[in-house]
């Protein structure tokens, strides 16, 4: 198996792992399709009602970020070998920072949120420590999202310079990432799944062309 196909595997698996993690809390007998958008108290009650699944969901989503880092590290090696070292390395630094932030955020949701959820069920009120920590967690998420979109745009520019894939892939990655970044800056929120779409496309094309 050549390096293109090897690189494709973690990029595709990252999307699969994230999709599993994002789907777990919203399906099944105790699933809640609105669990990610509920008010604080209702969110904690929903988590408490499905705590084990919530933990596994965040494990899968944390693993997805690590797989993404592995895949993009391998892609960076290919891009450097093709002579493009600036944008690919900037992209990798950005992804590394974003993944660290996301893993911390996922751990926060898997541990602190579950603990607060159990206390909410026991006392009937949201623990006073939780909302400040939730705001801190969202700040982590926001920085993660901004950095990740910028990193993906850098990879799009790098792809354009080396011709590893058709030019539309590079342009599509840049345009999609910048558009989602602008939407984030306007609305203040985004779906983390958006960070996995360009790498999924890149992974599929590398697999097909490998």
What is each residue range found by the language model?
Residues 1-210:
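Hydrophobic, aromatic-enriched alpha-helical segments typical of multi-pass transmembrane helices
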């Amino acid at each position: 198996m050549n390096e293109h196909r090897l690189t494709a595997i973690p990029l595709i698996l990252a999307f699969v792992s994230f999709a599993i993690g994002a789907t777990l809390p919203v399906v099944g007998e105790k699933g809640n399709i609105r669990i990610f958008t509920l008010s604080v108290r209702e969110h904690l009650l929903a988590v408490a009602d499905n705590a084990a699944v919530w933990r596994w969901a965040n494990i899968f989503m944390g693993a997805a970020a690590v797989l993404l880092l592995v895949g993009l590290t391998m892609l960076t090696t290919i891009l450097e070998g093709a002579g493009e070292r600036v944008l690919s390395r900037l992209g990798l630094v950005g992804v590394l920072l974003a993944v660290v932030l996301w893993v911390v955020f996922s751990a926060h949701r898997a541990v602190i949120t579950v603990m607060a959820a159990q206390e909410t069920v026991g006392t009937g009120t949201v623990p006073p420590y939780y909302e400040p920590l939730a705001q801190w967690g969202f700040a982590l998420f926001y920085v993660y999202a901004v950095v990740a979109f910028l990193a993906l745009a850098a990879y799009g520019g790098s792809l354009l310079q080396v011709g590893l894939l058709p030019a539309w892939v590079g342009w599509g990655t840049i345009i999609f990432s910048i558009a989602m970044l602008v939407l984030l800056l306007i609305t203040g929120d985004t779906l983390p799944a958006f960070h996995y779409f360009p790498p999924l496309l890149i992974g599929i094309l590398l697999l097909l062309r490998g």
